[in-house]
């Protein structure tokens, strides 16, 4: 899916980050990982947050995001 803004075109990808401590850290980790292979990241939209639970305890926070980056033709 590509989104046009002005004279630019942006590509959107979905990523999920995980963290043992918080949703914010999970989102930060997802952006850091994505930025290693995607150039010119512009917007991160959080679409879902959940937790993984084992034996009645939270073991991971997960943040699902849509990331947009400038399309390079």
Per-region residue spans from a language model:
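N-terminal, polar/charged subdomain of small-to-medium soluble alpha/beta proteins
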Residues: 2-73
